[in-house]
Amino acid sequence: MSAIQKRLSNMEVRFDESEVIVIDMGSGFIKAGYSGEDLPRVVIPTIIGERENTQEDNSTQPGDSKPNKVFSKKFGNEAYAHRSDHDLHYPIRRGIVKDWTRMTELLEYVFETELQVNANQATVLMTDCPMSNKDDKHHLAQIMFEHFKVKSFALQNTAVLSMFSNGTTTGLVAESGEGVTYTVPVFEGYALPHAMQTMEVAGQEVTNKMISQL
């Protein structure tokens, strides 16, 4: 048995190969789909657009009606398309979730609208940013089990998954996304966080620099 097979066989969560939903949450984009497929089915910006609307509450006595604040929300590409009349919110900053409420709403949108699946019948594998701490991992697992009530859930380091995708278990992974760049040494399928290096210069800074040169 190869090192990769041994590593995978020791994972605590066993999955039904045909029904695993894979979700990659990034600062710039969320990608989601099914394991075994070549490409994700969903690629949307990690954005929520909100616009505050006011409507009268007519449930009280005549003359006592009060305005209610109602938020119009849009997600992903639709949010970006309506950026002129919606306030944009970015739940993930520099690879770390900063707004768990909006992150949960965005995941609801991915499950219900984009993938059109019932989360409580789903088996989910989600990528984990190498910089996330234990509290972040626990919070995400709590949301998946208590809010979405998924059948099974696993969280795996993105650097380790990159190693597996290249058919090896040991090496140095360098990744640069929308909000953060990092290098992570991986040995026999385990990331070495004490040797990780990070830099908060990534795709967004490159984009901003190019725009400034136009």
Task: Please identify what each model-predicted range represents.
Residues 8-47, 164-193, 210:
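Gly/Thr-rich phosphate-binding beta-strand-loop-beta motif of the actin/hexokinase/Hsp70
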Residues 2-6, 11-16, 134, 147:
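C-terminal helix/juxtamembrane-tail motif
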